UniProtKB/Swiss-Prot annotation:
It comes from Sulfurihydrogenibium sp. (strain YO3AOP1). It holds the Pfam family Ham1p_like. Its EC number is 3.6.1.66. This is dITP/XTP pyrophosphatase. The active site is at D69 (proton acceptor). Homodimer.
Amino acid sequence: MKILLATTNEGKVRELRQLLKDLDIEILSLKDMDKKLEVEEDKETFLENAIKKATSYAKFYKLPVIAEDSGLEVDALNGLPGIYSARFFDIEFGKEVLKEIPENLSKDEKNNLKLLRLLENQTNRKARYKTALVFYNFDYGIWTEGVCEGQIAYKPEGNQGFGYDPIFIPEGYNKTMAQLTPEEKNKISHRGKAVSKLVEILKKVL
């Protein structure tokens, strides 16, 4: 059975392939598809965005789809970046801290730098990663969610993972997500928890 992962994010594809390895399926990503479809993530929650992506890509490619929307919620910023996590650097909120930005930074590095600058004088650094995962195959849909609690570090550390991993310290750890091995991360991450729930359900229905 072929299942399409509705993402072009190589980090997400890599993690999802590893987490789904126990299922007897062939995994494709959007980069494997000849025809291209852009689905705007314009909903107000991770779950709504994931549902929109799953149904839109399934109808377009005529394939079962696994879609995800995830992000980082920081208490001191009233839940931001939240659904804007992937494009946090570009939104209007917090633009005042974006002076003297080094050139040639990646998108992830820009997002991390903006967040660290906004929290510069903040002692409350509590945060959490959240994800909503949706499987849709025309006959039915399944959704699961995962949360990983933690806090924001004072500087980036580590070179594993992607996104906010270099500045996110999971609860119970004294190092960032980017300092964990992929196996360690998958055991505790928001994505790992959501996929584990989904795999258990899919084993019964596929």
